[in-house]
Amino acid sequence: VVIASFANGRVIALTAAAGQPVWQYEVGQPQGRTELERLVDIGGQPLVLDSAIMVAGYQGKLALVDIRSGQEVWSKPASSFYSPAIGNGNIYLASANGDIQALRGNDRRELWVQDQLSWRQVTRPAVSGDYLVVGDFEGYLHVLSAEDGSLQGQLKFDSEGIRVPVQVTRDGNLLVYGNGGKLSVLRLEQDD
């Protein structure tokens, strides 16, 4: 099965051999009077988790969908440009307004919300051990505690901004790409 997400807020499963549709799922229904109000979009790739996918949509919801049937396992109202991140038994989501929230993985109860990065156009959170890392439109990298969302550090990386989500390598390094073309491998170190 091939999973594809689209700008119309739909996720579609296709057979790998023939590309035939198997199922489709909508993260939200367009509502409102203007085109902007009716916009429902999936900006990130669905996150594949064993027999399910997790997907978030702009002006839609965060949902876990069975990969075989396309049936919704659970959903929660949300608005995000990116797919969620998973780590430490939790779900981390950057909301469309820049707030970052943590949900407990087993019951989706909200653990914390970090609103100090509101309206900074943050990237998808990258989970690196006990920390989350996001970039923003001004080119800063922000390091947050995965446990409580508190800001732990900040680094000016690229004056032209960061739009590509930070990637975590197998050895725990951070792969960061800025809008100005700067590509770096960084390591998180805790000050004593």
Task: For each feature predicted by the language model, list its residue ranges.
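Short loop/turn segments that connect beta-strands within beta-propeller blades
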Residues: 16-19, 66-69, 104-107, 145-149, ...
